[in-house]
């Protein structure tokens, strides 16, 4: 796996984010008049609390930032589409702008959280819709990468070899 810092791999940080992502739920719990339980702000507060835990465990600044971002934005992949079937290009752009290099990790955290939250009550049609929306975001991200940095068709080394030129 990809080592990030301090000998820790990216997948380790994702697992830590999975473990700690709902750490702020007890302190953010509210009950609406109709009895519905909500956890407003738990993602942002949880990111801060998790970073404190990782600080005490001597994780690097970079690792704390990565886990913090994964936790802060873990609900966003499921919210990007809104009422639509798929998210807008603008929503996808903003998501990756905000999550930086942990955008894909955060999507995996979101999928795991969604499955765990629904548990045995998971409705396959709803899961299919959620998974398709998230898959679309990933496809758009990889398409963008191939457009932003397309493979070189020919290099200076190729030209030197083809025309028998010397460098310089």
What are these regions (language model features)?
Residues 1-126:
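Divalent metal-dependent catalytic cores for phosphoryl transfer on phosphate-bearing substrates
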Residues 50-56, 117-168:
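Charged substrate- and nucleic-acid-binding regions of tRNA-handling and nucleotidyl-transfer enzymes
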């Amino acid at each position: 796996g990809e080592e990030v810092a301090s000998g820790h791999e990216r997948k380790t940080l994702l697992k830590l984010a999975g473990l700690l992502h709902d750490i702020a739920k007890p302190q953010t719990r509210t009950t609406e008049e109709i009895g519905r339980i909500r956890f407003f702000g738990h993602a942002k507060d949880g990111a801060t609390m998790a970073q404190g835990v990782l600080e005490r465990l001597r994780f690097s600044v970079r690792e704390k930032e990565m886990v913090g971002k994964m936790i802060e934005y873990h609900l966003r992949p499921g919210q990007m589409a809104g009422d639509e079937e798929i998210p807008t290009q603008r929503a996808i752009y903003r998501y990756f702008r905000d999550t930086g290099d942990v955008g894909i990790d955060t999507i995996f955290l979101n999928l795991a959280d969604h499955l765990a939250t629904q548990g045995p009550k998971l409705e396959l049609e709803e899961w299919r819709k959620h998974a398709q929306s998230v898959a679309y975001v990933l496809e758009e991200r990889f398409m963008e990468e191939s457009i932003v940095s397309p493979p070189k068709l020919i290099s200076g080394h190729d030209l030197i070899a083809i025309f028998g030129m010397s460098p310089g």
